[in-house]
Amino acid sequence: FYTEVKIMLKGKTVVLGVTGSIAAYKIANLASMLVKQHADVNVIMTHNATNLINPITFETLTGNKCLVDTFDRNFEFNVEHVALAKRADIFMVAPASANVIGKMANGIADDMLTTTILAAKCPKLVSPAMNTNMYENRIVQDNIKKLEQYGFEMIKPAEGYLACGDTGAGKMPEPQTLFNYIMRTIACEKDLAGKNVLITAGATQEKIDPVRFITNHSTGKMGRAIAENCMLRGAHVTLVNASVSVEPP
């Protein structure tokens, strides 16, 4: 999905908020993917996140200063959290710890990340990542629902083996999935919003008799590309896969 060489985020400012979850290291790959699409990527880290991945990693990948300290004076703008919030076309907090989710849900702004997202009016995506018991805790679930009511889009965590040794929900989706969310949100004008599109892709088969059928060598790439484009433009897409050699979007 989105593996072809395209320049779809040129002129867009993407802000990534990285919190103290073990999945923080994966965001380096996401930042690199966004930079390859010519996005202006800015990373804000909590102090806890810096114990898991060095800010220099993000500065090297994005070419921008990684913001951590609210009172750091070594940057261009006078009120950086407000200036960056105004420039942002999209704000993604990933991985989002239970702590930061609670702060955002209750308007607490005590660091660079929470003050900036409080000032942002752009689309805001949040990808929770934590232990299963923490994620399923009623307090955390209430905070997630509250953020959804405030207009945040929550990215459902995957299920699987977690760093703590448990197996269950709470795993941050892979960078490709997060990248897809960003692309669908800001890459194109949503001129197909509200439309339902049905697409067939791949090598279809037409039966001749109980033994034989007519088919073709289609890989499904054309159907996949059309489905991808329609999704980016806001359509609700139903993709019917026949025998294909590519992954569906």
Could you say what each language-model-derived stretch is?
Residues 4-125, 131-220, 224-249:
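A cross-family phosphate/adenosyl-ligand binding-site feature
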